UniProtKB/Swiss-Prot annotation:
UniProt keyword annotation of Transcription present: yes
Molecular function in Gene Ontology: RNA binding
GO annotation, cellular component aspect: cytosol
Name this polypeptide is given: Transcription antitermination protein NusB
Pfam families per UniProt: NusB (PF01029)
UniProt source species: Caldanaerobacter subterraneus subsp. tengcongensis (strain DSM 15242 / JCM 11007 / NBRC 100824 / MB4) (Thermoanaerobacter tengcongensis)
Amino acid sequence: MNRTEAREWVVKMLYQYDVSKLPLEKIFENFYEEHDPGEQKEYIEGTVRGTVEHLEEIDREIEKYSKDWPLYRMPRIDLAILRCSMYEMLYGNIPVSISINEAVEIAKKYSTDDSPSFINGLLGAFVREKGLEEGEANDN
């Protein structure tokens, strides 16, 4: 499994957590029954756990940049994509441009026709206001 596939699974797990409220351990268990994450296991679990741990802060940031589009009206998959990308940019060591590009690609694959541009615009505004450089990784 490569990092792009792992990121897709992070989004799927965050989506499942959001809609089912299953404990994270059960979500991981279900995933490992059918998939071998290989060397991506640490990234997957760390990103899912970290996103859930910082969910309130991440959701506040998403609401701030969503321009009159409350979280409860967003497609749940878009919310999972945004949460994953914001977590990576705030707490991960992933270059900003990669995180945004992958978020847009996941949206193209799993969400509505309007979602990629919405996600790109929201994440772009977040990066500009936070002063994050397009290509740099966060030092947190």
